[in-house]
Amino acid sequence: MSQSSGGTSTPTTTATQPTSTSTQTPGTTQLLSTTSTPTTTATQPTSTSTQTPGTTQLPSTTSTPTTTATQPTXTSTQTPGTTQLPGTTSTPTTTATQPTSTSFQTPGTTQLPSSTSTPTTTATQPTSTASQTPGTTQPPGGASSPTTTVTQPTGSSSQTPGTTQPPGGASTPTTTVTQPTGSSSQTSGTTQPPGGASSSTVTSSSSTGSNDPCNSNPCKSPASCVKLYDSYFCLCLEGYYYNNSSSCVKGTTFPGEIGMSVNETTDLEDKNSVNYQTLHSSVVKFFENTFKKTDYGQTVILKVSKDSLMSSRSVMRAATQTVYVSVVNMFGENTKEDEESVASVIKEAVKTDNNVERYFQQDRCDYYGCVKSGSNVCRNGLQCTCKPGLERLNPQVPFCVAPTCSEPCSAEKKQLCLKKDNGAMECGCMAGYRKANGKCEECPFGYSGMDCKDQFQLILTIVGTIAGAFILILLIVFIVSMRSKNKKKSGEEQNLIEDDFHNLRMRPTGFSNFGADTSIFPKVKTGVPSQTSNPYANHRSMPRPDY
């Protein structure tokens, strides 16, 4: 028998009546960790399958006989000279047929390294039909691996087997069985790297069932399952935290608010969204890592908001946004931790986490709506005293809240629940509105407060108007008086100047007040006077000589 280098022959044996013999050709060698799994096909009486010497078995050769099995005596022998290395398993399979049924290989048959033999067997009830389709790939040094599919009476199945065996690898058969009820499809595939071990991955999809992870009731009673996008978490009543071993356990509450840096803020109000699940996972993981050395129990997210409920400052980064998550961290009932120690540990962890920006500690009494008293510091919300105006509606609920009205009040309609003097609750209008025509309407100008009874704005408007008018009148009087005073002063000065220049005569110098009527400056006469003003020039006053 001639085989390609490193190949292993897979004899096919058929048992006959009364004695069936399975023979392996001497000299056959099975390599380490190689599994030889012969495949037997049941045939009708007097059916012989023969391969002549020198015949080359090509891929996709199909032999499909039909047979009825009887009960014979099967014997399997190995011819001397067969060598099985350590770890080699030879598992011949014998199928009983009627007498005179033999299948053998003639020496000299050559099997190509890339020949494919993929037997596929289908069994039905009550009539059995066996069909074989050679399609197994035998690379050098490899061994064939059959893939078997069994279909049970009820339902239908479709399978697509695919096995890849590179040189030097060992094959691992993959078998898929469909269930009797329903319809399913499975696709199996085995990939073996050179010289490595096989790794199989099976992906199955079912047409029945739902994607809701809470349908299987994974949480122990009395905890409830809260569904996220494709996961869930278990939630207990207030004051309790969920423990996988014992369900809900009574604990100690430490409320607070944490600022988280996120890339996307859409749908954070929807617990079934992808973004909320991502945020929930980040917050829970942060606190689990922070309190891993304590008796920490669970973190419960109360609310997610873009605005902080405990700080007026908000932080915006270039590529990310900040959301504020109201949380409650649960510890053991007898924990040694207090509010200060818990807040200190969280603030230290914030410094080393890039996704967490800050932590705000919330007072436990404010969280429950109780009055601070004693050293217990509202450790038990059911026993604390409610603040004025708040009351505990249910004795089993630790929160103190404002009482509600018997009739519904809507903030959209500008309504709120008010408490009368007799303690009864009534739905009334908000401040700045009053009830008119069966609904809350805005107060007219100048009125405000409850039922528009506050007239402060109207009084302030009237007083302001009067004061403004009085100030304006004073300003006008002041301007008029100043202008009249300035005008009177200018007239007196002008009269004095005119009188002074009118009476002024400058005879020796020839100046006279010729400009007094139209100008304040005097004019000078440039003409030669007809008579000299020098007394010595007067000849009539001086005697003349006689000669």
From Swiss-Prot:
Residues 480-547 are cytoplasmic. One of its GO terms (molecular function) is protein homodimerization activity. Coiled coil: none annotated. It is found in: Cell membrane; Secreted. Residues 1-210 have a biased composition (Low complexity). Glycans are attached at N243, N244, N263. Keywords: Cell membrane, Disulfide bond, EGF-like domain, Glycoprotein, Membrane, Repeat, Secreted, Signal, Transmembrane, Transmembrane helix. GO terms for biological process: maintenance of gastrointestinal epithelium. Residues 250-366 form the SEA domain. Disulfide bonds join C214-C225, C219-C234, C236-C248, C365-C378, C370-C384, C386-C400, C409-C427, C429-C440. Residues 210-249, 361-401, 401-441 form the EGF-like domain. Epithelial and hemopoietic transmembrane mucin that may play a role in cell signaling. This is Mucin-13.
